[in-house]
Amino acid sequence: MADNDDAAGCPPPAPAPVRRRSSANYRAYATEPHAKKKSKISASRKLQLKTLMLQIAKQELEREAEERRGEKGRALSTRCQPLELAGLGFAELQDLCRQLHARVDKVDEERYDVEAKVTKNITEIADLTQKIFDLRGKFKRPTLRRVRISADAMMQALLGTRAKESLDLRAHLKQVKKEDTEKENREVGDWRKNIDALSGMEGRKKKFEG
């Protein structure tokens, strides 16, 4: 009984620590081949479904082509009615030919208008598509070539006729004659003598020098 009481009062043993797999074990586990999950549909069943889908698509295409042929026949029967040429004279045949030519010209005009509208719509669609690509940043950037160009040619291309005026920087500078520069240098060089003369130090220097 004492043993049973001690066993009941003791806490349950802790579970064994889970051993983590090392990176090498994980790598080996990832690279080793595993059994692929079996598909619920067999290969023969897949082939049968694909064949059935192709047959349905073929029937749909044939039906659409038949509908287009029927619409074309109905349009031609309403627009191109059979001609009644029995008992017509030469003048009446000429009038009929003129009427037919007028109808042909009208149809050509309508066809031209429709083609112009279609071309305009295609151009607008292409422009909108290009704008969408530009906004998304997925447009194809053209390859740029390196071009050697001088500074003068670059300014000429940017400014045009004003390039010469802007490049002529000396025109805005003040022109100084050579005589004026010599005079300024002479005046600057004699500033010590002028100071000595004003302060009365010139005579004292002569006494020391003598």
Swiss-Prot record:
The keyword Acetylation applies. The modification Phosphotyrosine is found at residue 26. The gene is TNNI3. It comes from Felis catus (Cat). Residues 1-23 are annotated as: Disordered. The keyword Acetylation applies. Residues 129-149 are annotated as: Involved in binding TNC and actin. Troponin I is the inhibitory subunit of troponin, the thin filament regulatory complex which confers calcium-sensitivity to striated muscle actomyosin ATPase activity. Phosphorylated at Ser-22 and Ser-23 by PRKD1; phosphorylation reduces myofilament calcium sensitivity. Phosphorylated preferentially at Thr-31. Phosphorylation by STK4/MST1 alters its binding affinity to TNNC1 (cardiac Tn-C) and TNNT2 (cardiac Tn-T). Phosphorylated at Ser-42 and Ser-44 by PRKCE; phosphorylation increases myocardium contractile dysfunction. The record marks 80, 97 as: Involved in TNI-TNT interactions. GO terms for biological process: cardiac muscle contraction; skeletal muscle contraction. This is Troponin I, cardiac muscle.
